[in-house]
Amino acid sequence: MAGKGGKGLLAAKTTAAKSADKDKDKKKAPVSRSSRAGLQFPVGRIHRQLKSRASAHGRVGATAAVYSAAILEYLTAEVLELAGNASKDLKVKRITPRHLQLAIRGDEELDTLIKGTIAGGGVIPHIHKSLINKTSKE
């Protein structure tokens, strides 16, 4: 009892099914989580590292990795900017551990965050106030 309408619907379904199959063949290009978040640091790698080191038996949320990558990227950019300024002040084109040391110790917040020793960084020049204007009594 299929009339004209039945054949038309069946034909429409088959053409729609064919176009759906073509759409399935055209896969979207994979987009990394770093590019989705607008970051340069690898979110997937940081997520894997967090899972391997977490005391929660590998249970780390997806946004935790994105947030951690954003923090690391921001801190790296901040340190590199300050170290680049230090190397530019010394008229050198290459950033050395000395420039990193000057940049970190020159910024109060970074100094409190990074309290460790930087290999090859040298020392920060400092003369105590009592030694600057020492007058001899004669």
Curated annotation (Swiss-Prot):
Subcellular locations according to the entry: Nucleus; Chromosome
Family affiliation? Belongs to the histone H2A family.
Gene3D superfamilies hit by this protein = Histone, subunit A
Q: Supply the alphabetized keyword list.
A: Chromosome, DNA-binding, Nucleosome core, Nucleus
Q: How does it assemble?
A: The nucleosome is a histone octamer containing two molecules each of H2A, H2B, H3 and H4 assembled in one H3-H4 heterotetramer and two H2A-H2B heterodimers. The octamer wraps approximately 147 bp of DNA.
List this protein's GO terms for biological process.
heterochromatin formation
What SUPFAM superfamilies does UniProt report for this protein, alphabetically?
Histone-fold (SSF47113)
**UniProt feature, compositional bias: Low complexity:** 9-18
Q: Check the record and name the Pfam families matching this protein.
A: Histone, Histone_H2A_C
Q: What is the protein's given name?
A: Probable histone H2A variant 1
Organism encoding this protein: Oryza sativa subsp. japonica (Rice)
GO terms for cellular component: nucleosome; nucleus
Q: Which PROSITE patterns match?
A: HISTONE_H2A
**Keyword field contains DNA-binding:** yes
Provide the function of this protein: Variant histones H2A are synthesized throughout the cell cycle and are very different from classical S-phase regulated H2A. May replace conventional H2A in a subset of nucleosomes. Nucleosomes wrap and compact DNA into chromatin, limiting DNA accessibility to the cellular machineries which require DNA as a template. Histones thereby play a central role in transcription regulation, DNA repair, DNA replication and chromosomal stability. DNA accessibility is regulated via a complex set of post-translational modifications of histones, also called histone code, and nucleosome remodeling.
KW rRNA-binding (keyword) present: no
* Region of interest: Disordered: 1-42
Q: Which residues form a coiled coil?
A: none
Which CDD domains does this UniProt record tie to the protein?
HFD_H2A
Q: Where is the composition biased (Basic and acidic residues)?
A: 19-28
Could you give a GO molecular-function term held by this entry?
protein heterodimerization activity
